[in-house]
A protein has these predicted regions:
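Hydrophobic alpha-helical membrane segments
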Residues: 2-278
Length: 278
């Protein structure tokens, strides 16, 4: 049951005010967690930037390096190649499994903290860890099933894949909001689809806010999606009327359209220059 002061009671369809209000509540209730997530974002940004610079500086030049690499490869014994490939595959599988476990724990803990922040509760590391441990396998398999659905729909048709990705971005909040006694994996997908029905544009709106804000966009999206899920769940449980979808939720479409026009304009200018130079 939601508290009298629960923000979920006041349905807010504006993705900007919803997300930043949720971020404010997050900082007020769990400042340490907010700093930790910001640190994760900074680390990821620096890692990506460093990787990009390394890729640029380490590009091989000339055909001689390609031919010498080809000759060296031909001189290697086939048994050594098989061994190296086998070890590489095993290591890759280990990294995938370990990465999946770590990602599940982080997703579960962050989602749990956001859910509790929306209720004005402070959460310790121990509480978040144990809450995630109790729901780990349900969260792990539910997320895996969601990724398979997103991948499958994207292969068939891009738009359904995007729709699935938007919907299942709220899945961790649902699982971490429910009792640890709940075990259904498919059931979590069914519940989420019912709760989010007709409001996917709001999920798109929050994702747009997160995408266009530099550096802190990740934590803004994390808080915004948590707040959106809770008000969707509250309105569904209490059968309250949801307001009209705010026009700012469509801002992402406008930005995508402008980007396409800009790319088209640049290509047109380039073609005109090429044709004129002939």
């Amino acid at each position: 049951m939601a508290k009298a002061t629960d923000p979920a009671k006041q349905y807010n369809s504006n993705p900007f005010t919803l997300s930043f209000s949720a971020l404010e509540r997050f900082f007020k209730s769990n400042l340490v967690w907010a700093i930790i997530i910001l640190a994760f974002g900074l680390f990821g940004f620096l890692f990506q930037a460093t990787g990009s610079m390394a890729d640029t500086s380490d590009k091989p030049s000339g055909s001689s390096s390609v031919s010498s690499s080809h000759d060296a490869f031909n001189n290697i014994d086939s048994g050594v190649i098989i061994t190296v490939v086998t070890v590489a595959v095993v290591l890759m599988l280990i990294f995938i499994v370990v990465g999946g476990v770590i990602q599940t724990f982080l997703t579960g803990m962050f989602s749990y903290v956001i859910n509790q922040s929306e209720q004005g509760r402070s959460v310790s590391l121990s509480e978040a860890f144990h809450a995630t441990t109790k729901r780990f396998w349900r969260l792990f398999w539910a997320n895996l099933l969601a990724q398979l659905k997103i991948f499958g729909w994207t292969l068939l048709l891009i738009i359904p894949g995007i729709v699935a990705a938007l919907r299942y971005s709220l899945l961790p909040y649902l699982i971490m909001n429910e009792s640890e006694k709940e075990k259904g994996v498919v059931d979590s997908h069914t519940k989420l689809k019912t709760v989010v029905k007709g409001r996917l544009w709001e999920v798109f709106g929050v994702s747009t806010v997160a995408a266009i804000i530099p550096f802190i966009g990740g934590i803004v999206g994390l808080a915004g999606r948590g707040a959106l899920y809770r008000q969707l769940q509250y309105s569904y449980d209490h059968k309250t009327k949801r307001p009209k979808i705010h026009w700012l939720n469509y801002l992402g479409l406008v930005l995508i359209g402008l980007l396409i026009l800009l790319i088209g304009f640049i290509i047109s200018i380039a073609l005109a220059v090429i044709i004129a130079s002939r």
